[in-house]
């Protein structure tokens, strides 16, 4: 299988989901999935279940959100404010974001390691404005991390585009699902139609 084959399959799948299924499917330029989820959670004001193992979403738990991890098969717990504080200070290696004591390239330069941050410092800095404990370089790195990690820091133009697309997206009719499942010989799904 080639990358072109993969992208063609994904495009076909997205088109079919948008046309046949009773769900809104959003793809917004310059927005990642977590940006879209964050904007919708905050603007719709409804109870939400986020189905993801990504701990970045813990920062949204303050917005009437619960999160379930399908990998761990359990609900994700965590304090929204502490989780955001911890990621802003310690970075997120999985997303390529270094801690505030390390420069931008530390995670990509082979053989280099981040400068460690003691748990005691992390606790001491909680709830304090970064300007009060950061050097100039640390503050620059803190602001870098805030821009990359904080789901409250999504650029306004992206937020507007997400909200606009959500309002304008038309969903497929639920009654068309049976036709889709039959045409694609999806017998198991046909038997569980009510779950859609």
What are these regions (language model features)?
Residues 194-196:
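Short, amphipathic C-terminal "tail helix"
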């Amino acid at each position: 299988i080639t990358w072109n084959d993969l992208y063609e399959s994904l495009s076909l799948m997205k088109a079919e989901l948008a046309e046949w299924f009773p769900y809104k499917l959003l793809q917004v330029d310059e927005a990642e999935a977590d940006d879209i989820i964050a904007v919708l959670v905050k603007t719709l004001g409804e109870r939400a279940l986020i189905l993801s193992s990504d701990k970045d979403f813990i920062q949204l738990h303050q917005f009437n959100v619960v999160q379930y991890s399908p990998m761990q098969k359990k609900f994700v717990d965590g304090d929204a404010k502490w989780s955001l504080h911890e990621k802003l200070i310690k970075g997120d290696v999985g997303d390529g974001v270094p801690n505030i004591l390390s420069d931008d390239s530390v995670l990509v330069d082979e053989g280099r390691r981040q400068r460690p941050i003691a748990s005691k410092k992390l606790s001491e800095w909680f709830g304090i404005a970064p300007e009060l404990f950061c050097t100039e370089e640390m503050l620059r790195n803190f602001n870098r991390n805030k821009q990359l990690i904080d789901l409250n820091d999504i650029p306004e133009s992206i937020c507007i585009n997400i909200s606009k697309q959500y309002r304008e997206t038309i969903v497929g009719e639920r009654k068309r699902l049976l036709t889709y499942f039959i045409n694609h010989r999806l017998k198991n799904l046909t038997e569980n139609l009510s779950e859609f």
